[in-house]
Amino acid sequence: MSSGPADDPTAARAAPPNGAVRAVVTICNQKGLHARAAVRFVKTAGQFDAEVWVRKNGTEVPGSDIMELLMLGAAPGAVIELTATGREAEAAVMALARLIECKFDED
């Protein structure tokens, strides 16, 4: 897990909100962020008192919306940035990064 933009590091982007926790992760399961993986992501995100956002190539979507996550088209090898705010933001980002790094417990 590392910190930094998920898209081109030279691209202009809005700064994350104060107190936001961020992590950059690579989708490493065989099917990418598909329907079952998105459901697991949303369920995990929902366990925390935090607002989670997912960013890929400059597009940012709420981590609570399965359809929006699917629309990111995060295939295997895609680099995404997780950002969270709220009381449990750090725990949420850590759990989501771990879920992704564990290939959504699929492979």
What are these regions, as identified by a protein language model?
Residues N18-V24, V79-E81:
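Intrinsic-disorder/low-complexity, polar/charged segments enriched in Ser/Thr/Lys/Arg/Asp/Glu/Gln
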Residues T26-P76, T83:
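Compact, glycine-rich, soluble single-domain proteins
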